[in-house]
A protein has these predicted regions:
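Iron-sulfur cluster-binding electron-transfer modules in prokaryotic oxidoreductases
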Residues: 1-198
Length: 198
């Protein structure tokens, strides 16, 4: 905690539900006195950072089992950030931390169920015009483990039209442009961003 005192941290922003839960349970107030913890999606919403009407598209939203969004229903937060053209993709993705490695038999069955759900959602999105017949379906999430699991579906569905990504990465691409990541890395490397190794 003393290592970070000079920074006068007011808010810790996290992007992972498991990280959020761990920090909350690990004497957060002792480490960051007088500080609050908030999910990045809810933080962006507080700052009124969201996609404009022109930037909005149809998306599937995968709400992870360990959602970092704690202030309100995650679907409400996601719609506020990305627009109303969002369809929730129910069911666990099957990644579940280490489940895919420790119990691949169970994880595979969970993945098959999720794949069926994605196919249903894809059909509904195309039938209602949320996405075009040849457009990619983007499934967005807030969980690193889920992103890894959802990325596997692109190969499994064999139509090449499914992409998985983080909600904040999709927003960054639309708001900051396709070069946002190299620009961010360059700014960090040039000393424009405070880095702390604890």
């Amino acid at each position: 905690a003393n290592t970070l005192n000079y920074l006068d941290i007011k808010t810790v922003v996290v992007s992972c539900g498991t990280c959020y839960d761990q920090l909350q349970g690990y004497k957060f107030e002792d480490i960051f006195p007088g500080c609050r913890i908030v999910d990045i999606h809810e933080f962006l919403l507080e700052k009124d950072i969201k996609l404009s009407a022109e930037q909005q598209a149809g998306y599937l939203f995968h709400d992870p089992c360990h959602s970092p969004m704690k202030q309100q229903d995650p679907m409400k937060t996601v719609k506020a950030l990305l627009g109303d053209q969002i369809r929730k993709s129910d069911r666990c993705c099957g990644e579940s931390g280490t489940l895919g490695v420790t119990r691949p038999d169970i994880a595979t069955q969970v993945r098959f169920r999720k794949e069926e759900e994605i196919r249903k959602s894809e059909t509904q999105m195309r039938d209602t015009g949320m996405v075009g017949a040849k457009d990619n379906i983007k499934v967005l999430t807030s969980c690193p483990s889920c992103l890894q699991g959802l990325s596997r579906y692109g190969d499994d569905l064999q139509n090449g039209l499914l992409e998985a990504d983080y909600i904040v990465v999709e927003m960054a691409k639309h708001i900051l442009g396709d070069q946002w990541m190299p620009e961010y890395v360059a700014a960090a490397n040039a000393g424009g961003i405070e880095r702390v190794l604890v």
